[in-house]
Amino acid sequence: LTAKLGYPITDELDIYTRLGGMVWRADSKYNIPGGASFKDHDTGVSPVFAGGLEWAVTRDIATRLEYQWTNNIGDANTVGTRPDNGLLSVGVSYRFGQQEAAAPVVAPAPAPAPEVQTKHFTLKSDVLFNFNKATLKPEGQQALDQMYTQLSNLDPKDGSVVVLGFTDRIGSDAYNQGLSEKRAQSVVDYLISKGIPSDKISARGMGESNPVTGNTCDNVKPRAALIDCLAPDRRVEIEVKGI
């Protein structure tokens, strides 16, 4: 009975050693001149040492070259000798029950990150408010009712709505900033009253920044004509961000 310890040199070639013991029985018979004969036997355990190489020809079949040494077999006092035994052997082994290695499980590719979409809507302030005012007109409320229907149809998941108020350049910067904030807040308050959650919508006043008329009204001098020319700058923009 031996224990085998192996170490892989390559994927196919192992070096190994076996250590253990062998139970033996030795029988002896000898004759004495004159016709008498005697028989005797002995049993015991001797240490076994072995070492070798094993090469995997296939998944199931392997060959090996081994040298085994057994020390002190028998008892010299009982059977008259106590030899050692050395054995050089070449063998072939077949391994039952070997199975193909399972194919590696490939994790599915992660789902692409959801695309964040932003929708932009622009409403004319002259439709929503009277000039220089921040209170919604009836026709302005009707325009926002239509806008609310569009926002509801979008139904953004985890989305948000930002209302941006803009004025024209008539008046001081501070006045126009305040007016734009009030107009944006008026639109927010109305949309909240229609059903948009208050934590999903916010107001931001942009003052007279980002005019869309550019320099087209620079040569317009009469005030009434200038107010009409700068009408596109007076607007409310609504940004809807969602997935």
UniProtKB/Swiss-Prot annotation:
Topology of this chain in the membrane: Multi-pass membrane protein
A Pfam family reported for this protein in Swiss-Prot or TrEMBL: OmpA_membrane
Intervals holding Sequence repeats: 107-108, 109-110, 111-112, 113-114
UniProt keyword annotations, A-Z: Cell outer membrane, Disulfide bond, Ion transport, Membrane, Porin, Repeat, Transmembrane, Transmembrane beta strand, Transport
Single GO cellular component term: pore complex
PROSITE patterns, sorted: OMPA_1 (PS01068), OMPA_2 (PS51123)
Main location per the UniProt record: membrane
Family assignment from sequence similarity: Belongs to the outer membrane OOP (TC 1.B.6) superfamily. OmpA family.
Region spans: 4 X 2 AA tandem repeats of A-P: 107-114
Protein purpose: With TolR probably plays a role in maintaining the position of the peptidoglycan cell wall in the periplasm. Acts as a porin with low permeability that allows slow penetration of small solutes; an internal gate slows down solute passage.
Disulfide bonds, paired cysteine numbers: 217-229
Gene (name only): ompA
Lineage: superkingdom: Bacteria
Subunit architecture: Monomer and homodimer.
Xref: SUPFAM superfamilies: OMPA-like, OmpA-like
Gene Ontology molecular function: any one: porin activity
Protein name as it appears in the record: Outer membrane protein A
GO BP field: monoatomic ion transport
Subcellular location: Cell outer membrane
Membrane-spanning segments: 1-8, 13-21, 47-56, 61-68, 87-95
OmpA-like domain: residues covered: 116-243
Site (Part of salt bridge gating mechanism) residue list: 64
